């Protein structure tokens, strides 16, 4: 909890209020499978954008290939959004329809 002080200029009173701080939301970045993007390109994206090892990247790629989607990582809003944009730009530059999405992670 943090203290916030409010000053009322008309009455010249200082009021102390307790404010409960809330942790910022985290976002899951999900890679989506498609029938056109080569598996090796997906592995490269996971290594380059998400800094995963080759083995981790292959596991994530296979999960997306089998189930249709896979978790790439959990990040703050700004980082997650940046990673989604990076994937979309790189895929577009290479002529692939690869997509990522981001969704709010449920609080436990």
Curated annotation (Swiss-Prot):
This is ATP-dependent Clp protease adapter protein ClpS. Involved in the modulation of the specificity of the ClpAP-mediated ATP-dependent protein degradation. GO terms for biological process: protein catabolic process; proteolysis. Pfam families: ClpS. Binds to the N-terminal domain of the chaperone ClpA. It comes from the Bacteria. The lineage of its organism: Bacteria, Pseudomonadati, Spirochaetota, Spirochaetia, Leptospirales. Belongs to the ClpS family.
């Amino acid at each position: 909890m943090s203290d916030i002080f409010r000053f009322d200029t008309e009455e010249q009173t200082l009021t102390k209020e307790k404010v409960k701080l809330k942790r910022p939301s985290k976002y899951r970045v999900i890679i989506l499978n498609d029938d056109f993007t080569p598996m090796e390109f997906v592995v490269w994206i996971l290594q380059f954008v998400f800094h995963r090892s080759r083995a981790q990247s292959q596991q994530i790629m296979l999960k997306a290939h089998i189930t249709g989607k896979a978790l790439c990582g959990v990040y703050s809003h700004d980082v997650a959004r940046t990673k989604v944009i990076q994937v979309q730009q790189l895929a577009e530059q290479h002529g692939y329809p690869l997509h990522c999405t981001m969704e709010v992670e449920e609080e436990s």
